[in-house]
């Protein structure tokens, strides 16, 4: 058997399915399995090539008539928060964050279900069980961490931690952090916890000497993805490679 062929990733193409972002469009994805000793290396290369990870699968859009999904990464070392982001950082200055191995907890799942029930009732993840959640967190052959964000302790003398309000599942790559999935307490809208987690990942990337924070795909016109282009400067993966994004006028500075 050819050793190279045995260790090289095999790519597959999904059947057409309704697009979750653009009404009336059909989506297809190309995907491969991230398993074995080369999984971290492959995750690095594929993420840099516009793929995203979900459990032990790396995928990217391969739609026949649409190229709306654009991979986005923040240039961490050049990032400058705008006025709104500085306010968000200040509002959440009381939160503590801790990094853990990719292992699920009952507390995380409870917050996850609350988030889905309020934000994504009709989404493809809406019926996920505790087992599904555990698989989402644990089924990784790459360097994955869980970051928990908590309120201060109610009683400083107690061993009980503060309330869990946000969680990020993130991969550590050779050139950045990739935010695989994040969720938060939807009742704390004034805290803008989604924005805060991105800001925290930018801070962490800089502390680790990593140049990028990967946010996944941005679709122009999709409200649920609009937040991604507010973190500047950033690069978009186009036909000519990673290209500096030049925002239109009106983006808050």
From Swiss-Prot:
<dbReference type="InterPro" id="IPR030700">
    <property type="entry name" value="N-end_Aminoacyl_Trfase"/>
</dbReference>
<dbReference type="InterPro" id="IPR007472">
    <property type="entry name" value="N-end_Aminoacyl_Trfase_C"/>
</dbReference>
<keyword id="KW-0012">Acyltransferase</keyword>
<comment type="function">
    <text>Functions in the N-end rule pathway of protein degradation where it conjugates Leu from its aminoacyl-tRNA to the N-termini of proteins containing an N-terminal aspartate or glutamate.</text>
</comment>
<dbReference type="Pfam" id="PF04376">
    <property type="entry name" value="ATE_N"/>
</dbReference>
<dbReference type="GO" id="GO:0071596">
    <property type="term" value="P:ubiquitin-dependent protein catabolic process via the N-end rule pathway"/>
</dbReference>
<keyword id="KW-0808">Transferase</keyword>
<comment type="similarity">
    <text>Belongs to the R-transferase family. Bpt subfamily.</text>
</comment>
<protein>
    <recommendedName>
        <fullName>Aspartate/glutamate leucyltransferase</fullName>
        <ecNumber>2.3.2.29</ecNumber>
    </recommendedName>
</protein>
<dbReference type="GO" id="GO:0004057">
    <property type="term" value="F:arginyl-tRNA--protein transferase activity"/>
</dbReference>
<dbReference type="InterPro" id="IPR007471">
    <property type="entry name" value="N-end_Aminoacyl_Trfase_N"/>
</dbReference>
<keyword id="KW-0963">Cytoplasm</keyword>
<dbReference type="GO" id="GO:0005737">
    <property type="term" value="C:cytoplasm"/>
</dbReference>
<dbReference type="InterPro" id="IPR017138">
    <property type="entry name" value="Asp_Glu_LeuTrfase"/>
</dbReference>
<dbReference type="InterPro" id="IPR016181">
    <property type="entry name" value="Acyl_CoA_acyltransferase"/>
</dbReference>
<dbReference type="Pfam" id="PF04377">
    <property type="entry name" value="ATE_C"/>
</dbReference>
<dbReference type="GO" id="GO:0008914">
    <property type="term" value="F:leucyl-tRNA--protein transferase activity"/>
</dbReference>
